[in-house]
Amino acid sequence: MEHQKTHYHSGGIRVLEDLMDSDRLNSLIARTEKPTRFMGGELNMRMKPDAEFKFALCFPDTYEIGMSHLGSRIIYNVLNNREDTFCERAYAPWVDMEALLRENSEKLFSLETKRPLDEFDIIGFSLLYEMCYTNILTMLELSGIPFLSKDRGEDAPLIVAGGPCVCNSEPIADIMDVLFFGDGEELNNDFMDVYASCRHRGLNKHDMLVELSKIEGIYIPSFYEPTYGNDSFASLRKLEPAAPDRIKRRIVHDLDLAEFTGDLVVPYMSIVHDRIALELFRGCTRGCRFCQAGFIYRPVRERRMKTLLDFADKQIKCTGYDEISLFSLSSGDYSEIHEMVPTILDRYKDDRVSVSLPSLRIDSFIKDDLKKIQSVRKTGLTLAPEAGTQRLRDVINKGVNEDDLLRAVGDAFRSGWHGVKLYFMIGLPTETDEDILGIAELARKVSREFYSMPKEMRGKGLRCTVSASTFVPKSFTPFQWEPQISTDEVLRRQALLRSALKGIRGVEFNCHFSETSRLEACFARGDRRLVSVLIGAYKRGARFDSWDEQFKKEAWDEAFMENGLSCEQYANRTIGIDEPLAWQHMDSLISMEYLKREYERSKQGIVTRDCRSGCNGCFGEHCKEYCNMHSSGSEETE
């Protein structure tokens, strides 16, 4: 059967229908708390209604969060730069809009043309965070689209997804037709080339999926079937002979040649990151053992400063933004950072454009750059020691010490900063109460550093926020085998830290909601059995699970019980080092032997050096193929 749909009637009938639909939807939009979430029509929005293929790029969270995501902005322009494709945007409707759509029997629609999502050829989701999975179900149900791939017919839109959660997408694998593993710039174009060819040849859905499975980085979940034993994952059996045994992560080797992005869409409302984001480089060489992004985006690939400045020039002119964020996993490691900062500030001094460095490591913190940055305006200052003692920082391979932190905050305070955020984790492997109390002691020393300055330099006083999230074991990290501590233990350690921080001048404490961290750990290491739990929780009202005020614990507890599973069996157990992993068919390119070696080194508190100092063999026998640091020597310790 031909995978083909006709979405448009001809002539004036369609024009009249469009006007009627628009008026009806606008009346609903006007009744929401934030109508600009759904209006569309923003500056630099793309319009290509005559393109052959219609692609709905869906972000399963609110508009203000989705519009802040650089990856989605890149893919929006990659697809719209194709002559044959019109990419439109859609976001998870907040609870007020969901209720209005249901009450009025309206379907979820795109921002650009207000087209119902079920009229698109392809619906693509960004998978950034496990706690957004129920929002995917909301968006599908509001579009009249069955949840499970096996229940969707030939004429249904193809449901695809990409993003870091694809590292272990098994809990939602039965929902997706196609998953994109790795960098998306080239992968999306390759996908659309093959998709267009299949459509033109009139292939049915199965044959199209076979063709798509031949693209490096494409995973077709329906071509594989899991088996279980002893109440845990055992293996994944291949059902389609043409499918690859393992799905290889796609890498863009030269970011200067990759499509960066077109003109940024400028929202009518404030969004989380309301500024120009320049991705300095992709990947990280530091090797923090809890950090999934630090491993799955390797190798490090830098953009040339000229590429970045050309993009900044264009965006300053076409958006009116007055802040540029130098964005990467560790921006201070960019080889031209000390030239980049003053160049940008001087280049745009007449426009009063400021620079922010949101991902500075403590040991790459430079006082001269601070003074230059604050010459326009002071942006936020965030540092992440992660652990309260040097012993635990060595376990997680953080590679910084207390002196680094105190030097960094001291330089910042003397340069005019009065506010700083310090990020820590609770529940890291081998953590003890001594490590928890060490966080408070570190905060106390930061406070002393500030109040040791002369009174005239202190302004309105110190604003130091200590934030403590809960450790979540993630796939393709050395800690993927480690359990998360129990919810009761998380709460005890949070209370211990809160008590220890009391009375420290200028310091306040924020901590992450423990229930969502538990669920995140469950889905981060889960298997396909969890899709029934996900659907069960959704039907009981679970939505926007990352929002504390929306989280419905009872819905999840009942859904787990109904399916004979528990959150604890995924989140709170130690996985055997040689036990089958639900994500082992995904080839992140990082050697499993390397991850095991790093896991063992963590137990001994041995620090592994930064890859920029020499190759540590993370790509195994393929280091020469993927990484330009292999010639620097063999693995060493610091």
Predicted regions and their residues:
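Conserved SAM/AdoMet-binding glycine-rich loop
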Residues: 57-58, 62, 314-421, 426-465, ...
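Glycine-rich beta-alpha loop elements in corrinoid/cobalamin-binding modules
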Residues: 93-238, 475-527, 535-548
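Radical SAM enzyme core and accessory elements
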Residues: 1-44, 51, 55-57, 503-638
